[in-house]
Amino acid sequence: MTGKERREQLLDVGRALFAERGFEGTSVEEIAHKAGVSKPVVYEHFGGKEGLYAVVVDREMRCLLDMVTGALTGGHPRELLEEAAFALLDYIEQDTDGFRILVRDSPVAQSTGTFASLISDIATQVEDILGMEFKQRGFDAKLAPLYAQALVGMVALTGQWWLDAQKPKKAEVVAHLVNLSWNGLSGLEPRPRLIGHRKN
């Protein structure tokens, strides 16, 4: 086996174990044993479990981000919202192990490669769409980042729930997500106010 093939094998083995057991529940010993190599081979290729995990997470993030970005290629804003929601649920359905890896807590020492940072990247793209929509409606476009985070977070958390529930069907989940977010946006007040007693 070439060095490149061995590296890919270790990535495949590590990915499967991280999806099943998480970062903390996986050891270098297990990775090496499942790959049929000694521990030093894992260290040689990745420097340790953290390095292997970082590469696995980076690949999954790129895959999901590419799917969502590819869905945001033009059209009516509501259609873009539908396509983005479908892209996330498609990824969850097609790459369940990858999604499980992304939503698990990453090691404390790792500053990048978290699900939160991925959601933030996606929200930045949605922000541009919302900013244009806000300008057309006379709303403050500076608030688009807040709404983008809320929308993307709603879809992502629903995706986590759907992964476990596996019902209703994907198209129905997307329809309900879009219904809530789109109709919520269509009734948006330019200057929302609180109606309760608490004001700060």
Model-identified regions with their sequence ranges:
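Amphipathic alpha-helical segments used for helix-helix packing
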Residues: Y91-G113, E127-G131, L157-D164
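Solvent-exposed, amphipathic alpha-helical segments
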Residues: V13-E20, C63, M67-A71, M154-W162
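Amphipathic alpha-helical packing segments from all-alpha helical-bundle domains
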Residues: R62-L65, S111-K135, P145-A150, E172-A175, ...
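Short coil/turn segments at alpha/beta junctions that flank glycine-rich nucleotide-binding fingerprints
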Residues: E20-E24, D95, R137
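Alpha-helical DNA-contacting segments of helix-turn-helix folds
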Residues: G51-E60, M67, L118
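N-terminal intrinsically disordered/low-complexity leader segments
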Residues: M1-E5, A141, E189-N200
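Helix-turn-helix
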Residues: Q9, V13, L17-G51, V55
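Hydrophobic alpha-helical connector segments
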Residues: V55, T69-Q94, A148-L151, V174
